[in-house]
């Protein structure tokens, strides 16, 4: 036991293979009696012996020496005998505590079985396992230094604290070592000083030797100039990207050298352990979309747990990167590397791409602009070099130079279609330019202009390719583009931050920027994909198994934490519909309903349909409402928090009679009778739940502690007297009633009820917006709105619709609404089982419509548009992306349309841009409808409407900002 105890300081015990559930029994717990005089040790002992989780047990064992000193041999001897096989001596291998930092699985296993660093050198490659070797070096140094402490416990503990973390030791830590160890061991002080003195910031010129690794002479020169003139890491990285005309790649010798020098030269430099998400969890998500097993395996190898060899990268480039049949995987990878963003401006070479605020581009920046000019210079030499073919061309300065410039700029700036997100030029343009300007005598044997273009641009479908004539002339908008702005494009934030549109406004006296830089996490050590801190993220299993995912939290350390494995989904399962096989992920229509096959399960909307085969009797009974319910508005409130127009419709969507009650949900008082305890206050919190309310209670209130003193949290709310408070606590402390969340608005002082698109009557426009519900018309809800393409509902004829917000707009009518509006509209199918699983493995709370809206809102990049939505009575989530100005310009309406089309495409393609986020990954199919501009100055609406719709208070940007 003495030998075992001596190993404690460096976490030299580890979990062996043991059954996951241990039952210590009374004999085991009696071990802790030996620690009766040390309550902290006794508590840890009891936690160890009662732990039912391997990971929890491992954590406790690593922390135990801090509470149970080595002198308590009886405790450790008893634990060893009570949990045989759990504690294993590691014979002095100080690197054991670092093994979890290994990226490659085989390296991690070798580390756990090793007895010295030499044992892992053949398996673990230093160039890839920087974090592991840095940790081992630190522990080796710590083992030597702290051994001088002998049996002096305090000195040893303060010494160990210096080496326990991979961050720089603070002055107080160093001072503590001096105080406790100076009189005990001068050698220890000298050893620690040698270690801590390596921490001052490195001089950038120390890395000048890396510049010689650059393959391009211009890059070598720029690198040396930058390292000798710039000081901060951010300046240096940005300068190198601009000077070398390349983005950082881990396989690039220059960047590889910088990584090695910054991480492993000093043993204490900060190196975060890689998360259990593979090297790039976002790109790993794309691998399952590969059409061929070869590309799927290569993709998985490159982005899972260890860097692929240079041969793997070359093979992926050769067989997959430009393969037209792999368009689904390649588009997905492009979404991760360079997501499509609205707007392009400030280019000096590709000037025809400027001033296009409502078009999508992947790479509108100065580097790509310069890259296009460089490409043109290379092509002037008479050859266009592609990875799989060289294309000989005539003098491009004389033969269609503007067309060639448009091609070079398109390849670099990468315009992308709002629906397909494709960035390739159209085949007809490719054939035309090669027929005119290709050097046919030098074409590769057997190739023609058509065959070459079949490899490069195999389609003329305008939803999947970019026509070049768009960029042969400047934008028709000129410089008048201020109607639509893009605060996050180009990205103003640091590399570890996420840029978000500032919709909250600013406190008085604050510098108010149109964007917010929020801390985030990367989805893997080699990932540039940033997610918001505090959010739940879905990532593929790090092994890359298709259909296997885990849910993680983006923690405050900037790393993904608390990962929980989900049940694997069989993506090979198909659905049989009408005798036809439908593959996973396929969306299609059955009559008027949109359906999707998800892992063998058929998920459809519940629209009532008329078909060409419908009988005369069916046509006469047809109402357009679910189950052909009668067009009567007698609202009932379901236990999911949704108001349904009638009991018939509630039953049709699956509610039992005991699962709804008459009256709208908003009219119910969830705090009467009071469901909270005496020391708590009941606060109404209306929500519409998407999860099964039988599994996760859809409560309409929250119980909060009664506080004498409220904190200073700024989360403005407005009471029923139009008085504003800093937060809900302050409002209730004053004995007031909540009217709506968000700052008080002058126009809401005179309370006038409005009907939301969800069929709920709100006390004011502000109250509706606080639920992120847009307004259909003024007054109490009185009708079931339009649902069917086959006709209209007579009750809407009695509704007075406001004036339309813009002329020249062909409006949309949201399902269940009466009045038209200028907006982009999405009707989305979701997987309820998946949402239930998310709720089960996370916080056991229901997932709501508001959860979806708040997440989608972050993906709308134009501040002139905002997101509203509701659950329709046809089992779809309806999303409305609406201009916020009272009289929106055509450009703003178009921007909202493009945002809607972009989100539809991301949902339908299962792009990691959305699918990485919980709960957005449960959105499986979407249909978009946009209110495009028409030439006529006025809009004629159907006879039932006779009226036009105003966007009510979409001028109220301040209100939008807080809601």
From Swiss-Prot:
Disulfide bonds: 627-652, 629-648, 637-665, 710-729, 718-744, 755-781
Keywords for this protein: Cell membrane, Disulfide bond, Glycoprotein, GPI-anchor, Lipoprotein, Membrane, Protease inhibitor, Repeat, Serine protease inhibitor, Signal, Wnt signaling pathway
Membrane topology: Lipid-anchor; GPI-anchor
Region (5 X Knot repeats): 31-332
Propeptide: 937-963
GO molecular-function terms, A-Z: coreceptor activity; endopeptidase inhibitor activity; metalloendopeptidase inhibitor activity; serine-type endopeptidase inhibitor activity
Knot repeats mapped onto the chain: 31-78, 98-135, 145-191, 210-257, 286-332
PTMs per UniProt: Localizes to the plasma membrane via its GPI-anchor. Released from the plasma membrane following cleavage of the GPI-anchor by GDPD5/GPE2.
UniProt-annotated site: Reactive bond, residues: 631-632, 712-713, 749-750
Keyword Cell membrane among record annotations: yes
Domain (Kazal-like) ranges: 621-667, 692-746, 749-783
Protein location: Cell membrane
Key word Disulfide bond present: yes
Leader sequence segment: 1-28
Domains (record comment): The Kazal-like domains mediate the serine protease inhibitor activity.
Role of this protein: Functions together with ADGRA2 to enable brain endothelial cells to selectively respond to Wnt7 signals (WNT7A or WNT7B). Plays a key role in Wnt7-specific responses: required for central nervous system (CNS) angiogenesis and blood-brain barrier regulation. Acts as a Wnt7-specific coactivator of canonical Wnt signaling by decoding Wnt ligands: acts by interacting specifically with the disordered linker region of Wnt7, thereby conferring ligand selectivity for Wnt7. ADGRA2 is then required to deliver RECK-bound Wnt7 to frizzled by assembling a higher-order RECK-ADGRA2-Fzd-LRP5-LRP6 complex.
Subunit relationships: Interacts (via knot repeats) with WNT7A (via disordered linker region); the interaction is direct. Interacts (via knot repeats) with WNT7B (via disordered linker region); the interaction is direct. Interacts with ADGRA2; the interaction is direct.
Family the UniProt entry places it in: Belongs to the RECK family.
Name under which the protein is recorded: Reversion-inducing cysteine-rich protein with Kazal motifs
Gene giving rise to this polypeptide: RECK
């Amino acid at each position: 036991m003495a030998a075992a105890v001596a190993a404690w300081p460096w976490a030299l015990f580890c979990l062996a293979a043991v059954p996951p559930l241990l039952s210590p029994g009374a004999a085991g717990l009696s071990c802790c009696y030996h620690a009766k005089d040390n309550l902290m040790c006794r508590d840890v002992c009891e936690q160890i012996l009662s732990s039912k989780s391997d990971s929890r047990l491992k954590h406790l064992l690593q922390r135990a020496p801090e509470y149970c000193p080595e002198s308590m041999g009886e405790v450790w001897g008893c634990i060893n005998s009570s949990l045989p096989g759990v504690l294993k001596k590691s014979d002095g291998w100080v690197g054991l505590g670092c093994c979890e930092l290994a990226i490659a699985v085989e390296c991690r296993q070798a580390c756990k079985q090793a007895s010295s660093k030499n044992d892992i050198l053949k398996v673990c490659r230093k160039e890839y396992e920087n974090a592991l070797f840095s940790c081992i070096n630190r522990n080796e140094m710590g083992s030597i230094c702290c051994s001088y402490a002998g049996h002096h416990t305090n000195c040893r503990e303060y010494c160990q604290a210096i080496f326990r973390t991979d961050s720089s030791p603070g002055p107080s830590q160093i001072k503590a070592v001096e105080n406790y160890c100076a009189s005990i061991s001068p050698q220890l002080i000298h050893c620690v000083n040698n270690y801590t003195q390596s921490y001052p910031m490195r001089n950038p010129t120390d890395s000048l030797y890396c510049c010689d690794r650059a393959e391009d002479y211009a890059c070598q020169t720029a690198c040396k100039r930058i390292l000798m003139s710039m000081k901060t890491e951010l300046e240096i990285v940005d300068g190198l990207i601009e000077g070398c005309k390349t983005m950082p790649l881990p396989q690039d010798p220059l960047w590889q050298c910088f990584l090695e020098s910054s991480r492993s030269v000093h043993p204490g430099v900060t190196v975060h352990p890689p998360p259990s998400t593979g090297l790039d969890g976002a790109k790993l998500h794309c691998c399952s979309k590969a059409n061929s097993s070869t590309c799927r395996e290569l993709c998985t190898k490159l982005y899972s747990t260890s860097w692929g060899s240079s041969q793997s990268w070359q093979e992926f480039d050769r067989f997959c990167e430009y393969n037209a049949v792999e368009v689904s995987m390649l588009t997905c990878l492009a979404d991760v590397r360079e997501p499509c963003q609205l707007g392009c401006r400030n280019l000096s070479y590709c000037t025809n791409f400027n001033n296009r605020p409502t078009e999508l581009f992947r790479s509108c920046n100065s580097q790509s602009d310069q890259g296009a000019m460089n490409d043109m210079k290379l092509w002037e030499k008479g050859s266009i070099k592609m990875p799989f073919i060289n294309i000989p061309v005539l003098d491009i300065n004389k033969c269609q130079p503007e067309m060639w410039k448009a091609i070079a700029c398109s390849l670099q700036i990468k315009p992308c279609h709002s629906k397909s997100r494709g960035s390739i030029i159209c085949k007809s343009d490719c054939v035309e330019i090669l027929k005119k300007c290709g050097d046919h005598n030098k074409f590769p044997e057997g190739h023609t202009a058509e065959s070459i273009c079949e490899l490069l641009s195999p389609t003329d479908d305008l939803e999947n390719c970019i026509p070049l004539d768009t960029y042969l002339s400047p934008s028709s908008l000129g410089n008048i583009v201020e109607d639509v702005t893009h605060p996050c494009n180009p990205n103003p934030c640091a590399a570890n931050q996420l840029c978000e549109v500032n919709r909250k406004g600013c406190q008085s006296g604050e510098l108010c920027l149109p964007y917010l830089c929020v801390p985030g996490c990367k989805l893997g050590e080699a990932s540039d994909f940033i997610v918001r801190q505090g959010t739940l993220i879905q990532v593929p299993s790090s092994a890359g198994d298709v259909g296997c995912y885990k849910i993680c939290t983006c923690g405050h350390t900037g790393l993904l934490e608390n990962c929980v494995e989900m049940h694997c989904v069989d993506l090979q399962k198909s659905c049989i519909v009408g005798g036809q096989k439908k593959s996973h992920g396929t969306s299609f229509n059955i009559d008027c309903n949109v359906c999707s096959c998800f892992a063998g399960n058929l998920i459809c909307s519940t629209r009532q349909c008329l078909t060409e085969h419908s009988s005369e009797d069916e046509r006469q009974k047809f109402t357009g409402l679910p189950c052909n319910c009668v067009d009567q508005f007698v609202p009932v409130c379901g236990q999911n928090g949704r108001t349904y127009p009638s009991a018939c419709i509630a039953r049709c969507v699956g509610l039992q009679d005991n699962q709804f009650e008459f009256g709208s949900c908003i009219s119910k008082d969830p705090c009467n009778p009071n469901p909270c305890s005496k020391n708590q206050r009941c606060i109404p919190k209306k929500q519409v739940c998407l999860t099964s309310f039988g599994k996760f209670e859809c409560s309409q209130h929250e119980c909060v502690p009664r506080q004498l003193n409220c904190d200073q949290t700024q989360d403005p709310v407005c009471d029923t007297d139009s008085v504003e408070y800093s937060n809900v606590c302050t409002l209730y402390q004053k004995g007031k009633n909540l009217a709506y969340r968000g700052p008080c608005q002058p126009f809401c002082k005179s309370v006038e009820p409005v009907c939301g698109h969800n069929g709920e009557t709100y006390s004011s426009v502000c109250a509706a917006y606080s639920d992120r519900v847009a307004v259909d018309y003024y007054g109490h809800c009185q009708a079931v709105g339009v649902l069917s393409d086959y006709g209209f509902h007579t009750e809407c004829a009695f509704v007075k619709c406001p004036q339309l917000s813009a002329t020249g707009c062909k409006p949309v009518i949201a399902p269940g609404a009466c009045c038209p509006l200028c907006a982009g509209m999405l009707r989305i199918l979701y997987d309820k089982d998946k949402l239930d699983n998310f709720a089960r493995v996370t916080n056991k709370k229901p997932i709501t419509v508001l959860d979806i809206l708040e997440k989608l809102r972050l993906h709308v990049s134009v501040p002139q548009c905002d997101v509203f939505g509701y659950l329709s009575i046809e089992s779809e989530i309806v999303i409305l992306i609406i201009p916020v100005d009272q009289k929106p310009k055509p450009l703003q309406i178009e921007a909202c349309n493009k945002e809607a089309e972009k989100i539809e495409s991301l949902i339908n393609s299962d792009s990691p841009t959305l699918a990485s986020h919980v709960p957005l990954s449960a959105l499986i199919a979407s249909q978009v409808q946009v209110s495009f501009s028409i030439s006529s100055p006025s809009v004629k609406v159907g006879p039932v409407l006779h009226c036009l719709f105003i966007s009510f208070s979409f001028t109220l940007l301040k209100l939008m900002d807080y809601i």
